[in-house]
From Swiss-Prot:
Record's bilayer topology term: Multi-pass membrane protein
Chief place where the protein resides: endoplasmic reticulum
Similarity section: Belongs to the cytochrome P450 family.
GO biological process: arachidonate metabolic process; icosanoid biosynthetic process; kidney development; lauric acid metabolic process; linoleic acid metabolic process; lipid hydroxylation; placenta development
Gene Ontology MF: a single term: heme binding
Modification Phosphoserine occurs at: S439
One Pfam family hit: p450
Ranges annotated as spanning the membrane: 11-31, 121-141
Name this protein carries in UniProt: Cytochrome P450 4A10
Keyword list, A-Z: Endoplasmic reticulum, Fatty acid metabolism, Heme, Iron, Lipid metabolism, Membrane, Metal-binding, Microsome, Monooxygenase, NADP, Oxidoreductase, Phosphoprotein, Transmembrane, Transmembrane helix
Cofactors required: heme
Inducing stimuli: By clofibrate.
Gene name of the encoded protein: Cyp4a10
Tissues and organs where the protein is expressed, per its UniProt entry: Expressed in liver (at protein level) and kidney (at protein level).
Length: 509
């Protein structure tokens, strides 16, 4: 036999041997994964044995919850299963969906961490800021940032809010004469971003005029959808597989757009603080705004807040501070448009307090109680954040005696709670009197800003902004629904509409 033939035979044998070993290893890995799948599934089945649920596939879980009907399916379960039910995403992944105020009170009164399996998927986008942090790091960041939302800080923000809102309303004046309805969410999103930039990030100028910011708004919308898709895809839980997928490429590109925006905001303010006069002026303030707190905390102690931590907090508040408020306001406007009698009563109340609206102050916001009731009722029907997830750090027993072991992930369905007929009679009816001062309700029946120690740090900022937006808008426009474009709510990180939120604008003067 020739040397070349012998070498070829050895090479072929080596390849064959390698393939055999690879096949054996592959089968072993598959077997290990199958055993892990089985054991995890059995553990979950045992953990949830006290909680009935709709029928589900052994591998695909509750497939009927996918798509546009997800909220409708959840509401069917709210009516049929008391307090909570397990939702299976696939054979070895399930959450207990909770929509009972007593259950909510128990979970929110504990110190369970955010569910890592879900929220870690957000880390490439918003980093580990207040939303994702747990334990002592979360406590330290929360304590550091709480002063940014003190009443003394928020009061002068009303002027900034009003300036941003009037700019949007001026744009709407040009559109009001058209025969077609307009999609309001994009306009409102730019306006709330403008407000956050002015109030929390010391930004001069207007986001609504600069067309460059539209790409950031679009990126945030894409990230919402991509995150939602990834949570529901078993294969995309693996970072490597996801990063090589088309959705992974889109997600990373959108993250880069969002990061470019926040990096620019941080750099601009850091450059301004290099000016000794500006720095001294800021340090003399009795209370600092959000970004200055972050920057000065780092400047006074270089180890206290890293660049990574700094950007995580900016990314988190930039998203939460504008997108959730934009969602809330858009749905509030839709609710008022579809209930003109309540819209008119709000308008009359605002007119009695503000006149023509040329001036609005913090003190005015407590003088529009009926408008506030309507805002809260709209937030009940359309909660900006439809759900949050916790992972049990210890076992828990609920008031009805049912229990869960450590490690189970619990989804607090704010949407389900707010539409639960056992909590809110006739839950689909828009009834602002539910929030009258003398109207009794459970302490955990209304949670648009979550509850407990980890409630939304900016809830007072958001409520104040929504009051200013609604008041000034109703003085200039009548809001009318477009019956040909009824919005379809979708449960993303923030409650969105599949087909936008379209309204007709009728100029009043």
């Amino acid at each position: 036999m020739s040397v070349s033939a012998l070498s070829s035979t050895r090479f072929t044998g080596s390849i064959s041997g390698f393939l055999q070993v690879a096949s054996v290893l592959g089968l072993l890995l598959l077997l290990v994964k199958a055993v892990q799948f089985y054991l995890q599934r059995q553990w979950l089945l045992k953990a949830f044995q006290q909680f009935p649920s709709p029928p589900f596939h052994w591998f695909f879980g509750h497939k009927q919850f996918q798509g546009d009907k997800e909220l409708q399916q959840i509401m069917t379960c709210v009516e049929n299963f008391p307090s909570a039910f397990p939702r299976w995403f696939w054979g070895s992944k399930a959450y207990l969906i909770v929509y009972d105020p007593d259950y909510m009170k128990v979970i929110l009164g504990r110190s369970d961490p955010k569910a890592n399996g879900v929220y870690r998927l957000l880390a490439p986008w918003i980093g580990y800021g207040l939303l994702l942090l747990n334990g002592q790091p979360w406590f330290q960041h929360r304590r550091m940032l709480t002063p940014a939302f003190h009443y003394d800080i928020l009061k002068p923000y009303v002027k900034n809010m009003a300036d941003s809102i009037r700019l949007m309303l001026d744009k709407w004046e040009q559109l009001a004469g058209q025969d077609s309805s307009i999609e309001i969410f994009q306009h409102i999103s730019l306006m709330t971003l403008d407000t956050v930039m002015k109030c929390a990030f010391s930004h001069n100028g207007s986001v609504q005029v600069d067309g460059n910011y539209k790409s950031y708004i679009q990126a945030i919308g894409n990230l919402n959808d991509l995150f939602h898709s990834r949570v529901r895809n078993i294969f995309h839980q693996n970072d490597t597989i996801y990063n090589f997928s088309s959705n992974g490429h889109l997600f990373n590109r959108a993250c880069q757009l969002a990061h470019d925006h926040t990096d620019g905001v941080i750099k601009l303010r850091k450059d301004q603080l290099q000016n000794a006069g500006e720095l001294e002026k800021v340090k003399k303030k009795r209370r600092l705004d959000f970004l200055d707190i972050l920057l000065l905390a780092r400047m006074e102690n270089g180890d206290s807040l890293s660049d990574k931590d700094l950007r995580a907090e900016v990314d988190t508040f930039m998203f939460e501070g504008h997108d959730t408020t934009a969602s809330g306001v858009s749905w509030i406007f839709y609710a008022l448009a579809t209930h003109p009698e309540h819209q008119q009563r709000c308008r009359e109340e605002v007119q009695s307090v503000l006149g023509d609206g040329s001036s609005i102050t913090w003190d005015h916001l407590d003088q529009i109680p009926y408008t506030t009731m309507c805002i809260k009722e709209a937030l009940r029907l359309y909660p900006p954040v439809p759900g949050i997830v916790r992972e049990l750090s210890t076992s828990v027993t609920f008031p009805d005696g049912r229990s869960l072991p450590k490690g189970i992930q619990v989804t607090l369905s704010i949407y389900g709670l707010h539409h639960n007929p056992k909590v809110w009679p006739n839950p689909e009816v828009f009834d602002p009197s539910r929030f009258a001062p003398d109207s009794p309700r459970h302490s955990h029946s209304f949670l648009p800003f979550s509850g407990g120690a980890r409630n939304c740090i900016g809830k007072q900022f958001a409520m104040s902004e929504m009051k200013v937006i609604v008041a000034l808008t109703l003085l200039r426009f009548e809001l009318l629904p477009d019956p040909t474009k009824v919005p379809i709510p979708l449960p993303r990180l923030v409650l969105k509409s599949k087909n936008g939120i379209y309204l007709y604008l009728k100029k009043l003067h």
